[in-house]
């Protein structure tokens, strides 16, 4: 609203995608384009308010995704901090998504694609003509420079273990325009195998390895927690059902309080050894329960189709 009390036109939603070079920003932006967002990659930051004003006046329902890259941010490291409150007034929904990955993985990606890191090969601060950055040094320098932006992010995704398709699905799940999500929060419920490592972006991690393991029943070994014989096996002693009853009470208590704190996303991972039987069963059941409670739920099984493992 301006000084005369006139409502300022607003863009429906603005998703700013920032993060480390090689972490998947282009993949994330393409995913947003696929679900209906107007994709603007690396515009001059200072031009964003004017651009948002034009878009808000030209259409009633404007969903915009903007890529923020090191090249643009490096010219004025404090620009985003100054612009964020201005853009907040101009958009009904402003989200800053930050993508990162382990340094060794980023170096590997640059080597495989033969792309040049925006900071590689340049003189290091205080160095002479010989003090040129390696790719690894460039990655670490960028991580340091982008830290103020990361600190302001609504959501951080670590793409170390994410294939491009997995990242596309994750972004689409997060920002898909869903008119039926009246609760204001999206719940991600994911199964995984601890032997393959944990996700770094989970809000809560639960361990299902206390349940009897269907792996040791040869008739069930090649099946998954989505198959009826495995579900019957896990239902047999009542432990899984009792655990789910406790989870229903826990989330019935927690989620309304997270909504009150304006938390838009909550991710819970449930793991077992291989991510094939117990965690898959529990995640499917928990997803059903949370959906029946009126929440938007996204279920993902990270390791279900890996080779059978204990």
UniProtKB/Swiss-Prot annotation:
Keyword line: ATP-binding, GTP-binding, Nucleotide-binding
A GO molecular function held by the record: ATP binding
Binding site for ATP: 19-26
Keyword NAD on entry: no
Pfam family, one: PapZ_C
Taxonomy, superkingdom: Bacteria
InterPro entries given in the database record: P-loop_NTPase (IPR027417), RapZ-like (IPR005337), RapZ-like_N (IPR053930), RapZ_C (IPR053931)
Family: Belongs to the RapZ-like family.
Role description: Displays ATPase and GTPase activities.
Designated name of the protein: Nucleotide-binding protein Mmc1_3333
